Amino acid sequence: MNLNATLIAQLVVFFILAWFTMKFVWPPIVKALDERAKKIADGLAAADKAKADLALAEKKVVEELRKARESAGDVRASAEKQASQLVDEARAEASRIIAQAREAAEAEAGAAAQRAKEALRDQVAHLAVAGAEKILRREINAQVHAELLANLKQELQ
């Protein structure tokens, strides 16, 4: 009988220990485990959120780089267009200056040719008078001489 009484006593002690453990020990352990699980879940959620934020930031960076490249391309195209426009304007200005210089040179050449013709006419008139004077071997009156030169000059024109 001792075996039965010991067994019953051990069962009673076991149930008291189980009840005590369930009442006082188990709730703090469960609470600690729940808190730990919550911290782990929060950490995983934060990691997932950080990963999503990183992906979003990478997308933003890629978009900003694309915009920057586009903007750089636009700036480069604008600069090339402006440079081309400046070159065209410089060419037009150079053409205008060359045309003006050509016109001025042609006008100067025409004026020089006209002056040369006038000088040549004067020389021809003087030579003709000198030749006529030598042929006639006589002195011509200065007034008559001037009239002859003017008439000869008019005829040569």
From Swiss-Prot:
Predominant subcellular localization, coarse grouping: membrane
- Key words of the record: ATP synthesis, Cell inner membrane, Cell membrane, CF(0), Hydrogen ion transport, Ion transport, Membrane, Transmembrane, Transmembrane helix, Transport
The UniProt entry's sequence similarity note says: Belongs to the ATPase B chain family.
Organism (species): Azoarcus sp. (strain BH72)
Give the subcellular location: Cell inner membrane
GO terms for cellular component: plasma membrane; proton-transporting ATP synthase complex
Q: Which InterPro entries match?
A: ATP_synth_B-like_membr_sf, ATP_synth_b/b'su_bac/chlpt, ATP_synth_F0_bsu_bac, ATP_synthase_B_chain
Q: Is Ion transport a UniProt keyword of this protein?
A: yes
Top-level taxon? Bacteria
Fill in the subunit field for this protein.
F-type ATPases have 2 components, F(1) - the catalytic core - and F(0) - the membrane proton channel. F(1) has five subunits: alpha(3), beta(3), gamma(1), delta(1), epsilon(1). F(0) has three main subunits: a(1), b(2) and c(10-14). The alpha and beta chains form an alternating ring which encloses part of the gamma chain. F(1) is attached to F(0) by a central stalk formed by the gamma and epsilon chains, while a peripheral stalk is formed by the delta and b chains.
UniProt keyword Disulfide bond, yes or no: no
Membrane association type: Single-pass membrane protein
Q: Which NCBIfam families match?
A: ATP_synt_b (TIGR01144), PRK05759.1-2 (NF004411)
Q: GO MF terms on file? A: proton-transporting ATP synthase activity, rotational mechanism; proton-transporting ATPase activity, rotational mechanism
Indicate what this protein is called per its UniProt record: ATP synthase subunit b
Annotated TM spans = 7-27
Function text: F(1)F(0) ATP synthase produces ATP from ADP in the presence of a proton or sodium gradient. F-type ATPases consist of two structural domains, F(1) containing the extramembraneous catalytic core and F(0) containing the membrane proton channel, linked together by a central stalk and a peripheral stalk. During catalysis, ATP synthesis in the catalytic domain of F(1) is coupled via a rotary mechanism of the central stalk subunits to proton translocation.
Q: Which Pfam families match?
A: ATP-synt_B
